[in-house]
Amino acid sequence: GVSTTTIHRALTGKPGISDQLRTTIQNLAVEMNYQPNLAASALKRNELHIAVLLPEPFLDNRYYYASLWAGIHKFMENAGNFNAVLDEYYYPLLPGAHGEALKSIYQSHLDKIDGFITIGIKENQSSYFIDQFNRAHIPCVILGTDLYGASKLCCVKSHDIMAGNMAAELFTTFLPDQTDRTILLTGNPLGQSAMIDQFYNLNAFQDYLSKTRSPVKLQTAYCTDINQLEEMISPFLSSREVLPYGIYASSARHTVKICEILEKHHLEKQIKIVGNDHFPESIEYLRKGTLTAIIDKKISQQSYTAAKILLEYLSLGRYPERSVMEVQPDILIRSSLSASDN
């Protein structure tokens, strides 16, 4: 026989037993349909504090970040057995603000938190303080964009290359081989405040056209200030002769802005628009036909998964399957919408 301590170590991934014995115990647990009593385990430890640092989901931020917050909240609503609470922190979408917020939390709240969830911002101070949290034995799960080299527990993100490929295929699959059409790409390839997910998305779109030798012509209207977008694309809307065949918006806020602009000019039925992300405004534009399709990167599923991974690691010692967990996107078209979609 084996002791209860040995069984606990085998089922929670803790060291102190051989790999062979661990595998034997885990296989038996699966055969017996064993489920750990999280409520009983929670009574033996103090309350876990999970810090979440994301932009506030207001104004234009709500299109993307409201979904991130929603996924975390949904998991926590059903995670009572973990004996955990959220400590929510916000920061403005400005250069350097993410690193400053991490610094403030590290200096003032380090002894009050057990785990951390935030987005991947490619700035030196952000990476530095994520490393500092790791050295203080506070695991961090990163959302949206991986920070290569940063000491995180794991990253949960969309499969951005797949998203770009899917959008390009949507535009070109039904075009005759010799069709000479123009597609306008909009977004911010440097990412919003140094997130680089759009960079991979847009690059994949262009790579797909190159690999398939598509005759489609590409034009770009990239901008960091969304208020500049209408002025940038106005030359493409000036006459029927120069109208693009389609527009691909690589971000949530560009998706909304493009729809607003084309409706303002009464061109929404003349140009195919593929946008990104599932949120109430994008679903409404899809439902009324302004959007042709949406690349749904399942933002709330990403953050739900991140919260689940972090709590299972802290409570059960269960490590993530991979250092980078990529959530595969879906394509939404009007006929695929359910009555529950807002």
Regions found by a protein language model. Give the residues of each.
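N-terminal helix-turn-helix DNA-binding module of bacterial transcription factors
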Residues: 1-46
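Hinge/cleft segment of the Venus flytrap/periplasmic-binding protein
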Residues: 32, 193, 209-212, 298-342
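Amphipathic helical "hinge" segments at domain boundaries
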Residues: 35-101
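Short, solvent-exposed amphipathic alpha-helices that sit
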Residues: 63-80, 163-167, 193-216, 257-261, ...
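Short beta-strand elements in bilobed, periplasmic/extracellular small-molecule ligand-binding domains
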Residues: 76-98, 181-184, 202-227, 243
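Hydrophobic alpha-helical
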Residues: 105, 115-135, 205, 216-283
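Flexible loop/hinge segments that line or gate small-molecule binding clefts
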Residues: 121-162, 279-287, 291
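Hydrophobic alpha-helical segments within soluble ligand-binding/sensing domains
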Residues: 155-182, 229-233, 282, 298-315
